[in-house]
Swiss-Prot record:
CDD domains associated with the record: CMP-KDO-Synthetase
Gene: kdsB
Enzyme Commission number(s) from the entry: 2.7.7.38
Protein name, UniProt field: 3-deoxy-manno-octulosonate cytidylyltransferase
Gene Ontology MF terms in the entry: 3-deoxy-manno-octulosonate cytidylyltransferase activity
Pathway participation: Nucleotide-sugar biosynthesis; CMP-3-deoxy-D-manno-octulosonate biosynthesis; CMP-3-deoxy-D-manno-octulosonate from 3-deoxy-D-manno-octulosonate and CTP: step 1/1; Bacterial outer membrane biogenesis; lipopolysaccharide biosynthesis
Record's GO cellular component terms: cytosol
UniProt cross-references to Pfam families, sorted A to Z: CTP_transf_3 (PF02348)
Major place of residence: cytoplasm
Entry keyword Metal-binding: no
GO biological process: CMP-keto-3-deoxy-D-manno-octulosonic acid biosynthetic process; lipopolysaccharide biosynthetic process
Catalytic activity entry: 3-deoxy-alpha-D-manno-oct-2-ulosonate + CTP = CMP-3-deoxy-beta-D-manno-octulosonate + diphosphate
Subcellular location as annotated: Cytoplasm
Length: 257
């Protein structure tokens, strides 16, 4: 199956609490955002745009040849920032836009292409995302690991930090083997959107479950938009949230050179 034409937008904020300026943090001689940009280009995207709120990031991106837009500084979410980009680029409503976070230098390009492809082949979905099997009990019960439940069409029914679906008979003392065989899915935070949805998103009221779980994707479900969830066994490497993450990612990249 051929990959559709799609645009990748990389939101890159300067003001991260645990690692301020992380898009510009040095990673093997290049800023983190340059590694992310390279992954996006390798995905086969027709266009790659960095969206930032900071002139320093804008300047660095221009230095390595990226297309970059300086966006409004007060967007409440990264999705709102991407919605601004969609309007400024005058993308048609049917255009597919992939949101690749600016702190994911280990994201496999194949997954970027996959999420775009799955949205293209599901005309009923406004959004596509990815999930991978949960393989261990501590992963299943970890609130920072978001779980997703799908219907028979691979559309999301719900996302939660809780271990859903709940197995009322087996969760007491469940081991890794039972978890691996249980069919639970871990959400991967990579999204493809139709431009028409992104234009509507800023006007959607935040949903009660979204506030409770602190999961933005629940807003789309609450307002009736279908989310296609493609399963994959391929997991991206860790993102960069802390100085320790930066060191770990550097070691991993160094080992592949």
């Amino acid at each position: 199956m051929s990959t559709p034409a799609f645009t990748v937008v990389i939101p890159a904020r300067y003001g991260a609490s645990r690692l301020p300026g992380k898009p510009l943090a040095d990673l093997l001689g290049e800023p983190v955002v340059q590694h992310v940009y390279r992954r996006a280009v390798e995905s086969g995207a027709a266009r790659v745009v960095v969206a930032t709120d900071d002139a320093r990031i804008e300047s660095a991106c221009r230095d390595f040849g990226a297309e970059v837009l300086l966006t409004a500084p007060d967007h409440p979410t990264g999705t709102d920032r991407i919605a601004e980009v969609v309007d400024r680029l005058a993308l048609v409503d049917e255009a597919i836009v992939v949101n690749l976070q600016g702190d994911e230098p280990l994201m496999p390009p194949e997954l970027v292409a996959l999420v775009a492809e799955r949205l293209d082949t599901d005309p009923d979905a406004a959004i596509a995302t990815l999930a991978t099997p949960v393989t261990a009990a501590d992963e299943l019960f970890e609130p920072s690991v978001v779980k997703v439940v799908r219907d028979h069409r691979d559309h999301a029914l719900y996302f939660s930090r809780a271990p859903v679906p709940w197995d009322r008979d087996r969760f007491d003392g469940i081991d890794d083997g039972a978890v691996a065989a249980g069919g639970w899915l871990r959400h991967l935070g990579l999204y493809a959107y139709r431009a028409a949805f992104l234009r509507r998103f800023p006007g959607l009221e935040p949903a009660p479950p979204e506030r409770l779980e602190s999961l933005e994707q629940l807003r789309a479900l609450w307002h009736g938009f279908a989310i296609q969830v493609a399963a994959t066994d391929q997991r991206p490497g860790p993102g960069v949230d802390t100085p320790a993450d930066l060191e770990a990612v550097a070691r991993r990249l160094q080992s592949t050179r």
